[in-house]
Amino acid sequence: MALDEKIYELRREKLKQIEALGQPAYPHKYEFTHTLPQVLSDYSDKTAEQLEAPRVNLRVAGRIMAIRLMGKAGFAHLQQSGQRLQIYVKKDAVGDKGFELYKLLDLGDHIGVSGYLFRTRTGELSVHVDEITFLSKDLLPLPEKWHGLTDVELRYRQRYLDLIMNPEVREVF
């Protein structure tokens, strides 16, 4: 069995586990309050104190482009329209089912999150997640982050991957 087939089967199994948690595999719609570019343009210049004064609650959606799990918490980067926003997921905030869902997510999956904005200790604008909604599973892996799509023929045949991975190509469209 080839590596891509193994990854495909592993992700299909994760999709079944997500459905077992009570999440639909491909929900029909997701209501969000802000797009990621809106959040970044409206709040990127705000300080931590300004974000806390009247707490900014929001619902956003995007594709997971980076994910890190550290015990009972984790970070991920969501991407939408070529812009990225960090999310912070804590087991105490999302509950056991929500954190189990987070542990089943992979790069390329689409999720929706609701929560409030804050700044991390390093000063990065982030969403402290209260609720995770699964939107769709990426069954095939995205190309490597650093090497990307180097094969020109593959870039033309799989144009959608080229648009996902290369911001300069997306700018042309």
Q: Where does each model-flagged region fall?
A:
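Class II aminoacyl-tRNA synthetase catalytic cores and aaRS-like
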Residues: 1-173
